[in-house]
Amino acid sequence: MKILYSLLLISSIILNTVLNISSQVYDQRILALKGKCYLDSNKNALYDEGEPGFGNVEISLGNATDYKGNKYPIRYSSADGTFIYDGLTQRTTYEFTFTNPKDYYFETYEKTLACPPGVPCIRPTVSADNLAADLLVANTFAYNIPLIKQVGVSSGSSILTVRISVDLGYVEQTQPPTQPPTQPPTQPPTPPPFTGSAVAGLLFTDINGNGIFDGRDVWTSNVSVGLYNFNDKTRALDVNGNVISSITTDANGRYAFENVANGVYCLWMEGTKYFNPGCVGRIEINSATMPKSVASDGVQSPTILRAGSFSLFLTGNSGYGGYAYNDIDLNGYLSSRDQGIAGIIVKIYLPVYNFLFGTVTTDSNGRWSFSGLQPGFPVRIEFVIPNDFTSTGANLVNFVTVGQSIDLSIGLIPKSLTGVNAGPSNPKSFVTTCFVKGSYNGKYKDEPTVVEINKDAQGKAYAQQSADYMKVLASHKDTGSVHGVAFNPDNGDKFVSSYHKTNSDFGPSGSCAIYKLSSGIITTHVNFNDVFGKSYCGGYAHYFDFREISTAGPLVGKASLGQMTYYNKKLYVTNLGKNEILVVPIYQNPNATNVERIPVANPGCSSGDDWHIFPVTVFQGELFTGGVCSGEKGSRLSTYILKYNPNSKSFSTVLFYTLGYARGCRYLDSFGSCVSSVWQKWSNNDSPQALLSTIIFDVSGHLIMAYKDRSGDISAVVSAPELLIACLGTDGLFYLESGGKCGSLVGAGVDQKSLTGLRYGPGNGNFFDNHKTGLHDYTNAFGATKGGRDIIVTTGFDYYEAFEGSIRWYNATSGKQLKGYSLYITSSNGRTPSPTFGKQNGLGDITSVYDSSLPQYRVGRVWLDINGNGIQDAGEPGISGITVFLIYGQQSTPTSQTVSDSNGYFKFEVDFSSNYYCVIPVAFFQAGSSITMRNADPTHPNTNSDAFLSTVDNVYVTSFTSSDAGGYYFNGCSFGIIPKK
């Protein structure tokens, strides 16, 4: 049976069905067509078990009559959504028109050329059908009509047209013979010769479910084997038109069918203590191309298909179980607050044949279980969850071994509670730090050191009309000098960390502390000097006199703490005194046992004394840091960006570049000459010195790097900070912007010129606009944070006026400044004392503040598709160690990369409602392997392979559109690899 579909218009679907059987005269049997209108609850354009039928849909058939010549009246789908048209004739084109009810519309759906496994597409009618027709056409996916609810849609605004024509071909003529009757033979008639083909094969008991005869497997006797037509699952006929009888396997598991006609068939296997997996295999007979049979085949047919061996699976008493629960705190594991969810469907599939073993549902406590299999047997377990729910981390598809005592549980949450309009892409405000002069308990003790800025801020906080945009969270007496800042979205707590700056005192807990700001209460979350010993971060006591610069200056960037970030209920902060990252728990009292210390070794500076780290961030679950070779001991001025491998406990370089590129002017002196910003080796002099202070990633995966001018924290009146971008290449390395461009992005400073008219920046350009017209070529960034989907927010100076401390909003894809807000202005006359630092790195780092959310993750898998069916079957292993690239939208460069784990899984954090591609170069796989079929089973998108081969770039590619809600999603990014033959 062959079914052909074609889609002509989005609102008009044309369906043509052709069923061909070769013979002599046209088949005249009358047909009935059965379909179903249903509410597509999960909007996957497929009818899934449990989705409700949709009644009262108007259906008309105006262009034809039934086989008696009667017109079909307008009718409506029944309460369960079904509709039946009786009395259809073959070779007639029928045009069905469906009219939508109010508040619903017809979904555009993909037609498939098959019925569900083991279900016939066409069958003879029976008396219980109460139909005039001889045959009933039903069950094909294409006859299920999906509707979607959308309030406001008017009735009749969505019209669906389905056109169908059926032709069953020819049948044998039935007229009586014209010759006289044949006289009875005097001896038994000679059987007709075998002119068809033989089909022979073996059955074996597959103990480990891998589809291969090995290990403890045995050949299986006394099992009934039937040959069926592949398409409609009816009994196969031989070349003489006779039904081919079932055969029982012999002691060696062998079976053989004789005289089989050309066609495509499958096997039906039934035996005591064995599962019947439905009609399995695809056995294609074409006698013209098949080999001749030989005596050892033991058959009489002239040609033979040696079908190989097929698996049989034993029944047993073992099973599996677990829970489905409402993950209230979005933490991905079952806790005391979480409650079980009843009614979640769990499906269990056997290996090799993708056969549904059984379906169970969770009870009132959220518990589910099944039994009936042998211990140690592999199965695939799928959770079918409501469309308005999402997983908080557990896989919807799982591959387990029967009999294990481990529960397989899944946490779920309504999508509406994942924080659709929350998260770092939707900040409400920003927190930054301000440096204050003098002792923390001196005359400026009440000056602000930590402030929160509203996302809508603009203007000048020091001017009354814009003051309401800024809120003071802490003062100098509370924290002293702090640079690092982090935010915990779970409870709204903010954290700031000590920083060493000349002329600005440490707070009451000294040089190595993290302070917590919680609902107006300021406490010391951890003092590392108490945990690990005095001067752990490098100690220093300020003099605040003529000795300050000479004694405090040399320790800038070498003592105290650097950048700090929050990730997964932990704080990550750099210890500048020891070139290490400290990982601090938030919900426990930090101590020497639970604070992790990660040393960051010199990656390549010619002298280890020249290696200085500062930034830290987490992107796609991976830890990054970086630093500079300072040149003090002769190493070349350069930058390293490093990624941590927790397995080897080591860092690898993902970006390296030197700092000798042309730079513009700090300012013009009184003679109009350029005061150079070219980076110099670290010293205690008033010269530009690169201190890599921040690394972050934008939504497109670009690496944003902020540099403080170290001299601004020592004595320089005007610092010259920098803001750079780098893009990820397909080799897994990042590449620094050049000429104001990064990959396919074109920045704001492609044609920029310095105050003296010269080109400057890496490759003579800068991606970000960093200048103050007529005053400075560099004004930021001391720190930076993601401020929205395509927004970067930075700290610097002089947005409106000279000697301001300012923050700026940037477009991350164009590098253009969008707006600014100034927090303070410092007196510049030299006579009026001021607590702030003007252009001398007066602000610290910055972080966004946002409502708690569950980020969105796309989970994929790379697996070995042993049987080549395009489906992730139980027993098929994942492929580990494969690098997968994520590409955002129409970018020409990757957004991120990751490596598949021991089970072949990988995941990417993605933005809402965005288009992405997952890409793997073909060269990453064994030569001779290939990609399996794509979208093999549209009804199970979570188990398909999604990839195709792009011959232009010789890569395997998948594509998907991310959801509009948080959670974990499992379709659109899987790769099935067929092994080398």
Curated annotation (Swiss-Prot):
GO CC annotation, single: extracellular matrix
Biased composition annotated in UniProt, kind: Pro residues: 177-194
Signal peptide: 1-23
Keyword vocabulary terms for this entry: Glycoprotein, Secreted, Signal
UniProt main location, coarse: secreted
Source superkingdom: Eukaryota
Keyword Secreted: yes
Region (Disordered): 172-195
Gene3D superfamilies in the cross-refs: Immunoglobulins (2.60.40.10)
InterPro entries for this protein: Ig-like_fold (IPR013783), Sdr_B (IPR033764)
Cell compartment(s), UniProt: Secreted
Residues of this chain annotated as glycosylated in UniProt: 63, 222, 591, 811
Family the entry assigns: Belongs to the serine-aspartate repeat-containing protein (SDr) family.
Name by which UniProt lists this protein: Colossin-C
Source organism: Dictyostelium discoideum
